[in-house]
Regions:
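Structural motif
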Residues: 39, 388-392, 451, 620
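Low-complexity, glycine/alanine/valine/leucine- and proline-rich hydrophobic stretches
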Residues: 578-627, 635
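A long, amphipathic alpha-helix that forms part
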Residues: 30-32, 49-50, 363-389, 399, ...
């Protein structure tokens, strides 16, 4: 995922300003206005771990559901990546139909990678005078997922739907009665989340650039620190320049707390304390600004000043980009339950990966984000009288990425002294989801349906596979300078004229095909034989540390995708890594490290982008469904069958 965030920083740009120019089942529920269906989407909930915790008696509400209804593994997508998986669920289509194949796609005409679910277009013509330019048309943000979402079918039948934080649904589809966008929603910088860290320590982090964050040197002068929160480029300036909002921190004499002043806002923070949401306004021109919001964490005042600022989130009270349907629904939620993380993946995993926050500090930040979500869920559920409600929880997924290793003493980076204190973190989060299920059941009646599902499972990420390096070593990818075997990314040392195949994204492999890729080197007639050869050799590849296969499945897209509407962006092969092995972050963006398979020593230590059969999700219901749903792709159709709707997926109406 860190590679995905790098794309946001490099190619995301000015999206924001471009657009801105313990219960008994079925008892205790209140009287409902009509029959209700509640779908709880628990991202990354693993079937095996859930089953173990149920057997241990630690998830009593899940157990009651399993005894009354259904508890089964839910087949995930190929590949098992969240935007792909949730798109399968939303549309009832596989990637060949909905067009989302990975977190990362590439333009075969330029070979530039981009985020798969959203495209941002700046405004068109401008009026220029001196250093200023006035856009004569607004920008736009387009959802790239194709296919008809299941809730649109319900709305056409007169069933109101509320879709909260559905991944791969930014900007919101506009076809539900109420929507709030989720995973895929950027911060105002146009990234998936870029934090700021202000420090008076000279040469902090060795002067290196942090992945997913920016270090800002500051000075303490007379007990005062002055700094600035960075926003996006100002679209009204001919020469690009970032907008900034200044802040001042006044230190007390004992170095125990600061008074933080941001615009008209003041906050008193002690060391180790998080602020609430602080409104931030970036001035674009004297008559127009861009509103955002940040949370601050005062990490230290001695010996150095250290202040963390969250990514500047879209302000739900004045959204710079569309994040809800209707447009004022986000503001309604914020007024009712308080400001909240509008960023699609709010848990700041990058701050932990870079060492800006400790594990304990990260977990506190994740708890704050999770508490906001649970508070909002209670508000929405209390007002849900009829129709279908989908509500998404992503806390377990993001924390599992960072905290799976403490449960795995066999992980190569396992540290008994450090990890033992976090060994129960993930399991405690599972217990928290069990409590959410209990609260939901308490509000449902006898005729209501509860569906609990996850998009994929989870496991330990022990070994990293550099797929582009494997292609290099096996003669499929050529280098301009063969003596240089440490290309950091974006194919900077690739000799395209002699390259037959390359990898991009977490599971995709592409033929360098004439007529598709601009630097194409392989005749279309040679494609099939080349793919067969690469697949056979990949499946024979063993991990030198264990002697076991490193890759257990390799699919041709024609074998697993039913449509071929996206041949320009679809990978030719989808690689299913053995459980415990994942494609590397370096290879995902065109990097070619010297070795092929290495230990994963990254703080990001749990994952699911492997062989899809190794990481199924879960399906749990309070009664048997009328129609079976063995996979994510069939689940929405099974839910629609509860309403007497059998034909799904259906074509989108023009």
């Amino acid at each position: 995922m860190k590679s995905i965030r790098r794309i946001c920083r490099r190619w995301g740009g000015i999206a924001a300003v471009a657009v801105a120019a313990g219960v008994v089942i079925g008892c205790g529920g209140r009287e409902a206005a009509g029959r209700r269906v509640v779908v709880l989407g628990f991202d990354g909930l693993d079937y095996e771990l859930t089953r173990e915790l149920i057997a241990q008696g630690r998830m009593p509400n899940f157990q009651r559901l399993s005894e009354r209804g259904t508890f089964a593994p839910l087949g995930t997508s190929i590949p098992p990546q969240s935007p792909v998986a949730w798109s399968n669920f939303i549309t009832g289509l596989d990637p060949g139909g909905h067009g989302i194949f990975d977190f990362i796609h590439r333009d075969p005409k330029t070979m530039i990678p981009y985020l798969s679910t959203t495209k941002t277009e700046a405004g068109g013509r401008t009026l220029t005078f001196d250093e200023w330019q006035i856009p004569l048309s607004g920008g736009s943000v387009e959802l790239l997922r194709r296919g008809r979402p299941f809730w649109e079918v319900l709305e056409d039948r007169g069933v109101e739907t509320t879709i909260i934080r559905m991944p791969a649904n930014f900007p919101p589809s506009g076809t539900a009665t109420r929507e709030l966008s989720g995973m895929g929603t950027p911060d105002v910088l146009g990234t998936y989340g870029t934090f700021s860290f202000y420090t008076s320590e000279p040469y902090a982090f060795g002067g290196r650039t942090l992945a997913g964050g920016v270090v800002h040197p500051v000075d303490v002068v007379g007990g005062v620190v002055r700094g600035a929160i960075e926003g996006p480029d100002n679209p009204f300036l001919v020469k690009p320049e970032k907008v900034r909002a200044g802040f001042t921190a006044y230190l007390d004499d004992q170095r125990k707390y600061v008074k933080l002043v941001v615009g008209d806002e003041e906050r008193l923070l002690r060391v180790g304390e998080w602020s609430d949401w602080v409104p931030v306004e970036f001035e674009l021109i004297p008559t127009q600004g861009l509103r955002a919001q940040c949370r601050f964490f005062l990490k230290s005042l001695y010996p150095y000043f250290e202040l963390y600022a969250s990514p500047p989130n879209i302000d739900p009270l004045a959204p710079a980009m569309p994040i809800s349907t209707p447009a004022d629904y986000a503001a309604d939620l914020a007024r009712a339950t308080g400001r909240f993380y509008s960023q699609g993946m709010p848990e700041d995993t990058k701050s932990l990966k870079t060492g800006v926050l400790t594990a304990g500090e990260f977990l506190e930040q994740a708890r704050i984000a999770g508490d906001e979500n649970r508070k909002q869920f209670k508000y929405v559920l209390d007002r849900f009288d009829d129709g279908l409600l989908f509500y998404y929880f992503g806390n377990v997924d993001q924390v599992s990425h960072m905290m799976w290793r403490p449960m795995d003493p066999q992980h190569p980076a396992y540290d008994p002294e450090h990890d033992v204190q976090h060994a129960q973190v993930v399991e405690e989060l599972y217990a928290g989801l069990d409590a959410i299920v209990g609260d939901t059941l308490a509000r449902l009646g006898e005729d209501d349906l509860l569906v609990v599902m996850s998009d994929h499972g989870f496991t330990s990420w022990r070994r990293s596979f550099h797929l582009n390096s494997w292609l290099r070593d096996n003669g499929y990818l050529a280098l301009l300078n063969p003596q240089r075997k440490d290309d950091p990314g974006f194919f900077g040392n690739v000799d395209w004229a002699s390259t037959r195949a390359y990898a991009l994204g977490l599971n995709g492999l592409y033929v360098n095909l004439k007529g598709r890729e601009v630097p194409g080197a392989v005749d279309p007639g040679d494609r099939d034989a080349l793919l067969a050869e690469i697949r056979e050799r990949l499946l024979q590849t063993q991990d030198p540390a264990t002697g076991a296969p490193a890759i257990t499945k390799v699919y041709r897209r024609e074998e697993v995708y039913t449509a071929a509407d996206h041949e320009d962006i679809a990978p030719d092969l989808i690689v299913g890594y053995a459980k415990g092995t994942r494609g590397s972050d370096e290879s995902a963006l065109g990097g070619l490290p010297p070795e092929v398979i290495v230990d994963n020593t990254d703080p990001w230590n749990g994952d699911h982008c492997m062989d899809h059969e190794a990481v199924p999700g879960i399906l749990l219901t309070n009664r048997a469904l009328r129609k079976p749903a063995p996979t994510l792709q069939t689940l929405a159709g099974a839910i629609l069958a509860e309403y007497g709707i059998d034909a799904f997926p259906t074509p989108r109406k023009d």
